[in-house]
From Swiss-Prot:
Molecular function via GO: histone methyltransferase activity; protein-arginine omega-N symmetric methyltransferase activity
Name of the gene encoding the protein in the UniProt record: Art7
Domain SAM-dependent MTase PRMT-type: 14-357, 366-690
InterPro entries the UniProt entry points to: Arg_MeTrfase, MeTrfase_PRMT7, PRMT_dom, SAM-dependent_MTases_sf
CDD domains: AdoMet_MTases
Function description: Essential arginine methyltransferase that can both catalyze the formation of omega-N monomethylarginine (MMA) and symmetrical dimethylarginine (sDMA). Specifically mediates the symmetrical dimethylation of arginine residues in the small nuclear ribonucleoproteins SmD1 and SmD3.
Keyword Methyltransferase: yes
PANTHER family documented for this protein: PROTEIN ARGININE N-METHYLTRANSFERASE (PTHR11006), PROTEIN ARGININE N-METHYLTRANSFERASE 7 (PTHR11006:SF4)
PROSITE patterns per UniProt: SAM_MT_PRMT
Protein name as annotated: Protein arginine N-methyltransferase 7
Length: 690
């Protein structure tokens, strides 16, 4: 049976009814649950198994029976490990019903169907005597996220110890330790604050208003693959320090709120702008089996891991890769200037039941530091990537070069399309006679209005809809400008909404009006990822257990609910180019309604497994042959087959993951079908050996 859902099309900006199976949400949740990523984490799997073997053997030697509770069992992998390690009984719970049903089949396929009691409930809903026959004396669980406590681990462990576990119960993992490292990074700071926009001579055009300067930002974590942040892009001001420890094994309740004040000394001068954060877990009671989520430069096993890898393997990628537990950046509300090495300061660390936040001050705070929130609209409206993009100097210079060469003082009348288009607003500061700013988003508009007021721009008018433009306003236009950027965009070409807006006013525009960007081109590049492909790759077997039923479930759901191309910040996920990029679509915004159906083939020029295809957009600001007239949302340096691609760090690219990558492939065949007025842009890819 099917149903109809109203879906926003980012290219047309229109809501449309789409037919979906009544189990679409189920398939979407299964495909995006992220279980596969965890199952590809070999270190996690081996160390959980090792901790189970060691702990159960120790309990056996002490003459104890072993009754295991597995909270959030997923595929049932930890329950099967516990059985293999010698547990007397295993009870597993899983509240996500599709996963629980799959776990039941996997347990049966591995001969454990009648040995594991599977409960389809949250652990906090389980009753001893009703759901499980006795309290467990060994808890194994994976309830952690990048922040450690963001999935509710504190409350779940507290309930388990109070209701489901014996007084002498052991836990895997036994405890966790959280670490912080204070740093300065002009690059990372761009993700958090707005810089002055200057012209090509360095003279200020737009200053951030006071409300932006005084805003403390959002306390929420910025999760990143911190090992991929170039070592030259930050200045560590302290060594990593332990800030909190969580004892999952103790019977005493874990506090839901704590504060830790650390007096630190700077290793070198700099501004305490941000905190790098990660954690490690001791899986066994003795603390011998350690799993660390540290970035490579702070990883306790860096030397051993580097020795095991090939010489051409990048050092940042020798540590075990995982996407479910990353590292995080927290931004200091007001950066603290540390003018000399050895300067003392205080790092204030806080957590509640689900999150953390930090502050840095010269003097110790006299009262608890409250969790800060955005008061300026910037952080609550835009993603970290978009904030960084607004500050991206090389990118901004290309737009400003076009505007400075194109805008005539007191003569140009400019229509700006897009959300938060500060560059378009800069045309007012460059002397345009008038600027019409299309900004229908309430908070984005409020932010831009504050910038207009602060910079005393007198010739700016805001619009909710382009259809509301009067004929006289359109007739006077000399320029239409966009980056383009729209809040609803996920994939780079979702910003083709610029073309849809132009179509609405196309017949009313004067001849000779200059449109920038004038065109856009989508490029495709076959690549070999070191690790990112694992998020969509089948697992097969894991630590000797057959998980093919899980693979089949995910594949069925992915076929129905996952786009053939998804958005990823590729700077965080190294890949080698297997060829040069090839254009797969060109769009002329003066004739946006034209449909396209194209095919082609890319010859692979470097040996490797094509486990991904990267796609991005080149925006052509003006029709000339200058590379300075192109703004790329893809590689930031020329692509060389066989070498790692350097990607733009402030925008996500499109990625296609082949379902079954093939060996000895010589060509990637592609096709593109674009129906702009319907907002349909579809790609297909195939691998061939010719």
């Amino acid at each position: 049976m099917s149903c109809f859902l109203q879906v926003m099309n980012p290219i047309t900006g229109q809501n449309s009814w789409q037919e979906r199976g009544d189990d679409y949400d189920y398939h979407l949740e299964v495909a995006n649950a992220g279980f596969g990523d965890m199952l590809h984490d070999w270190e996690r799997n081996q160390k959980y198994f090792g901790a189970l073997r060691k702990t159960i053997a120790g309990m056996r030697e002490a003459g104890r029976e072993v009754h295991v509770l597995d909270i959030g069992t997923g595929t049932g992998i930890l329950s099967m490990m516990a059985l293999a390690a010698g547990a007397d009984s295993v009870t597993a719970c899983e509240a996500f019903l599709p996963m629980a049903n799959c776990a039941e089949k996997i347990l049966a396929a591995n001969g454990a169907g009648d040995k594991v009691r599977l409960i389809r409930k949250r652990s906090t809903e389980i009753q001893v005597g009703e759901d499980m026959p006795r309290k467990a004396n060994l808890l194994v669980a994976e309830l952690l996220d990048t922040e450690l406590i963001g999935e509710g681990a504190i409350g779940i462990y507290n309930h388990a110890h109070a209701e489901l576990l014996t007084e002498d119960a052991l836990c895997i993992p036994a405890r966790a330790r959280c670490y912080a490292q204070v740093a300065q990074s002009p690059l990372a700071a761009q993700w958090n604050s707005l810089k002055t926009i200057a012209n090509l001579d360095g003279e200020p055009l737009l200053h951030p208003p006071e409300q932006l300067k005084s805003c403390q930002g959002e306390a929420a974590l910025h999760d990143v693959q911190l090992s991929q942040l170039p070592i030259s892009a930050f200045r560590p001001l302290t060594d990593p320090v332990e800030i909190f420890q969580f004892d999952f094994q103790r019977k005493q309740e874990r506090e839901k709120q704590r504060a830790q004040l650390l007096k630190l000394q700077s290793k070198q001068p700099g501004a305490a702008e941000l905190v790098f954060y990660w954690w490690d877990i001791q899986l066994d009671d003795g603390g011998e089996i350690l799993l660390s989520c540290a970035p490579y430069w702070a990883h306790p096993q860096l030397k051993e891991l580097a020795a095991e890898k090939a010489k051409d393997h990048p050092l940042p990628n020798v540590v075990p890769w995982r996407d479910h537990w990353m590292q995080a950046i927290y931004y200091i509300p007001k950066p603290l200037q540390l003018l000399e090495a050895g300067k003392s300061f205080h790092l204030s660390c806080h957590h509640d039941e689900y999150s953390l936040w930090f502050d840095a001050r010269e003097e110790a705070p006299t009262k608890s530091v409250r969790r800060h929130t955005c008061t300026c609209d910037l952080h609550m409206t835009y993603s970290r990537g978009r904030i960084g993009q607004l500050n991206q100097s090389p990118r901004n210079k290309r737009y400003l070069r076009y505007l400075e060469e194109s805008i005539e003082a007191e003569k140009s009348n400019v229509l700006v399309l897009g959300n938060g288009c500060l560059l378009g607003l800069a045309s007012s500061a460059l002397g345009a006679a008038s600027v019409l700013l299309h900004e229908p988003h309430r908070f984005s508009r409020r932010l831009l209005e504050s910038i207009v007021k602060h910079n005393q721009l007198k010739n700016v008018q805001f619009l909710d809809k382009v259809e509301e433009l009067e004929d006289s306003q359109l007739a006077a236009l000399t320029h239409i400008f966009a980056e383009p950027y729209f809040l609803n965009a996920i994939l780079p070409w979702d910003n083709f909404y610029f073309g849809s807006l132009l179509t609405k006013i196309k017949d009313r525009l004067p001849e000779g009006v200059k449109i920038s960007p004038c065109s856009a081109r989508i490029y495709a590049l076959p690549v070999e990822f070191l690790d990112l492909h694992k998020i969509r790759a089948p697992v097969g077997s894991c630590e000797g257990f057959d998980l093919r039923l899980f693979d089949e479930m995910v594949e069925r759901s992915a076929e129905q609910a996952v786009s053939l191309v998804e958005a990823q910040p590729l700077w965080e996920y190294p890949c080698r180019a297997l060829s040069e990029p090839q254009e797969v679509l060109s769009v002329d915004f003066s004739n946006f309604g034209q449909e396209h159906s194209l095919k082609g083939s890319i010859e692979l020029k470097h040996t490797g497994i094509c486990n991904g295809v990267a796609l991005w957009v080149y925006w052509q600001l003006v029709e000339d042959n200058s590379p300075r007239s192109i703004v790329s949302s893809g590689p930031s340096e020329p692509v060389v087959p066989g070498e790692f691609v350097k990607w733009d760090m402030f925008v996500r690219q499109g990625v296609h993951f082949p379902r079954k990558p093939k060996d000895a492939v010589t060509h990637l065949e592609w096709s593109t079908d674009f129906k702009p007025l319907l907002g349909e842009l579809n790609f297909s890819f195939g691998q061939k050996k010719l």
